[in-house]
From Swiss-Prot:
It catalyses: Ca(2+)(out) + K(+)(out) + 4 Na(+)(in) = Ca(2+)(in) + K(+)(in) + 4 Na(+)(out). It is a multi-pass membrane protein. Signal peptide: none annotated. Calcium, potassium:sodium antiporter that transports 1 Ca(2+) and 1 K(+) in exchange for 4 Na(+). Required for learming and memory by regulating neuronal Ca(2+), which is essential for the development of synaptic plasticity. Residues 105-120 have a biased composition (Basic and acidic residues). It comes from Homo sapiens. Residues 99-120, 306-336, 397-439 are annotated as: Disordered. This is Sodium/potassium/calcium exchanger 2. InterPro entries: K/Na/Ca-exchanger (IPR004481), NaCa_Exmemb (IPR004837), NCX_ion-bd_dom_sf (IPR044880). It comes from the Eukaryota. Its main location: membrane. Residues 60-132, 200-204, 265, 519-533, 591-602, 652-661 are extracellular. GO terms for molecular function: calcium channel activity; calcium, potassium:sodium antiporter activity; symporter activity. Alpha- repeats lie at residues 174-214, 541-572. The gene is SLC24A2.
Length: 661
């Protein structure tokens, strides 16, 4: 038995040395593991610098005004040229039916800020104390809430939604467009609710618009830059999602023309989302029909194979060989990216060093904790890969014997995915023989364990071994521990029956974290002279989209460019057709069907700018010949920087919106 295992390990070592199967080599250093974090930090720094730089004038003027007497009111400010930078003013006196916000509390007099005073508790620090350095605590708290929202969504909310879809028997396409989209966009949705009912400002709309641009431009740019190879995109997923998104944006622009949102307009936007869900139900059938109509007159060239298959008797004598590394094919929809198997939580990335840039070691696209495995675990992991490839090889050989084909392409469905193909192509020279089939005795029990490993890993509070991980663990422990105590982890088989508690409990925690995030963002903006709308367009939009950014980069590095692009657009469809109209509809129902005031020329221009950026994205992808290369990545970053600069200039009234309503 020892000789047999030694022979198997030697074979595994040779297999790992093969260049075509280098997926299980540990060749990533700590420096490369931190590469993504450094790049994200660089771009977030650029966003913050660009935001602050264009608000210096407003900051200095606000500081001058704050040192005056408390008798200075907003009327003289207007006479002195002090502008109010806001996208949405629900307190517009022209609209008699709009409720007025509560009066400013003591210590928060009108001379201290030009922001809309929402229903926030009184800050323990005064405005002067915050400007002298206390605002750093608010910035840290806001970033802390970004991490908290990511953890509660990825570790509890999305897994509970996965259980719900399994209980209801919903297909992956529909689940991805409904429940999983809600899980990924929950922070934006609750930010919109808080903006309508609590903040009485446009922070929710600004966050959704900014998140939409971030997903389209920044996420696609990161995927193009960090992909391992040039990814060829197919037209159908992009055409499908962009078509729905364009229609939704046009509807939104039309509804904004009269400065109010009626209840039936909100209902129409929700209906548009329902139509998208119905379409996703029949997505596969529609795609086949459309492609058949397009290719019905297309001439297909058929060539005979260059070599005939070996006779079955001769082939049976051959030793089994390992094929080349499986290559992931494109064609995935947004449903595949938003399931819990594909989403690698930020807690796992921070604590367990699950490198988002590392080569996938698991079977068919599942990242594993390879670095933290024991020697036995690593052996079982390699054995499971070899076992599955050997099983596919047996099916390939059988089909070749039956059909006489020289090469065979087998399509395999990824877990929780409906349209992602894996192409298994036998390799003639880049493979090592497995001698005497000795693997069969050592991996009989590995398959059952592999099936368990492929399930989403439950939350672990085990104490890390490295110092850096221990520091990170202590930082996030105040977030993780209350969640671990109050929410059952449905990824454990014994806790799956408690999924309703996890579902509603996660919603409660998301609401709390979103409220704290918006409140502290309001305090930061009030202190340095940046409106809530700019905070939503830049900082909040990027912070709430970081988990989707990491997931999209991981998927793009696996070769699934279509899945990353489609998910970026698909999540925006949910934000526009649910994240915005649902709070509006609830507001109109509560206030006896009174319309919601959106009297804002800046917001209208921001949505039009978003529409223009979407057209630029389509044009850029077409100019790059439907390939995700480095050039496309730099174009996306350039467009995102242009959007940030123009948005800030519009909010500061340095530029005037050319589109008037």
């Amino acid at each position: 038995m020892d000789l047999q295992q030694s022979t198997t390990i030697t074979s595994l070592e040779k297999w790992c040395l093969d260049e075509s199967l280098s997926g299980c080599r540990r060749h990533y250093s700590v420096k490369k593991k931190l590469k993504l974090i450094r790049v994200l930090g660089l771009f977030m720094g650029l966003v913050a610098i660009s935001t602050v730089s264009f608000s210096i004038s407003a900051f200095s003027e606000t500081d001058t005004q704050s040192t005056g007497e408390a008798s200075v009111v907003s009327g003289p400010r207007v006479a002195q040229g002090y502008h109010q930078r806001t996208l949405l003013d629900l307190n517009d006196k022209i609209l008699d039916y709009t409720p007025q916000p509560p009066l400013s509390k003591e210590g928060e007099s009108e001379n201290s800020t030009d922001h809309a005073q929402g229903d926030y508790p009184k800050d323990i620090f005064s405005l002067e104390e915050r400007r002298k350095g206390a605002i750093i605590l608010h910035v840290i708290g806001m970033i802390y809430m970004f991490i908290a929202l990511a953890i509660v969504c990825d570790e509890f909310f999305v897994p509970s939604l996965t259980v719900i879809t399994e209980k209801l028997g919903i297909s992956d396409d529909v689940a991805g467009a409904t429940f999983m989209a809600a899980g990924g966009s929950a922070p934006e949705l609750f930010t919109s609710l808080i903006g309508v009912f609590i903040a009485h400002s446009n922070v929710g709309i600004g966050t959704i618009v900014g998140s939409a641009v971030f997903n389209i431009l920044f996420v696609i740019g990161m995927c193009a830059l960090f992909s391992r190879e040039i990814l060829n995109l197919t037209w159908w997923p992009l055409f499908r999602d962009v078509s729905f998104y364009i229609v939704d944006l046009i509807m939104l622009i039309i509804f904004f023309l009269d400065n109010v949102i009626m209840w039936w307009e909100s209902l129409l936007l929700l209906t548009a989302y329902f139509c998208y869900v119905v379409f996703m139900k029949f997505n596969v059938q529609v795609e086949k029909w459309v492609k058949q109509m397009i290719n019905r007159n297309k001439v297909v060239k058929v060539t005979a194979p260059e070599a005939q298959a070996k006779p079955s008797a001769a082939r049976d004598k051959d030793e089994p060989t390992l094929p080349a590394k499986p290559r992931l094919q494109r064609g995935g929809s947004s449903a595949s990216l938003h399931n819990s198997l594909m989403r690698n939580s930020i807690f796992q990335l921070m604590i367990h060093t699950l490198d988002p840039l590392a080569e996938e070691l698991g079977s068919y696209g599942k990242l594993k904790y390879y670095d933290t495995m024991t020697e036995e675990g690593r052996f079982r992991e390699k054995a499971s890969i070899l076992h599955k490839i050997a099983k596919k090889k047996c099916h390939v050989d059988e089909n070749e014997r039956q059909n006489g084909a020289a090469n065979h392409v087998e399509k395999i469905e990824l877990p929780n995915s409906t349209s992602t193909d894996v192409e298994m192509t036998p390799s003639s020279d880049a493979s090592e023989p497995v001698q005497n089939g000795n693997l069969s005795h050592n991996i009989e029990g590995a398959e059952a364990q592999t099936a368990d490993e492929e399930e989403d890993q439950p939350l672990s509070l085990a104490w890390p071994s490295e110092t850096r991980k221990q520091v990170t663990f202590l930082i996030v422990f105040p977030i993780v521990f209350p969640l671990w105590i109050t929410l059952p982890d449905v990824r454990k088989p014994s806790s799956r029956k408690f999924f309703p508690i996890t579902f509603f409990g996660s919603i409660t925690w998301i609401a709390v974290f979103s409220y704290l995030m918006v409140w502290w963002a309001h305090q930061v903006g009030e202190t340095i002279g940046i409106s809530e709308e700019i905070m939503g367009l830049t900082i909040l939009a990027a912070g709430t989209s970081i988990p989707d950014l990491i997931t999209s980069v991981i998927v793009a590095r696996k070769g699934l460019g279509d899945m990353a692009v489609s998910s970026s657009v698909g999540s925006n469809i949910f934000d526009i057709t649910v994240g915005l109209p649902l709070p509006w509809l609830l507001y109109t129902v509560i206030h006896r069907f009174q319309p919601v005031a959106v009297s804002s020329n800046g917001l209208f221009c921001a949505i039009v700018l978003l529409f223009i950026m979407l057209l630029f994205v389509i044009l850029s992808i077409a100019l790059c010949k439907w390939r995700m290369n480095k050039i496309l990545g730099f174009i996306m970053f350039g467009l995102y920087f242009v959007f940030l600069v123009v948005s800030v200039l519009l909010e500061d009234r340095i530029l005037t919106c050319p589109v008037s309503i």
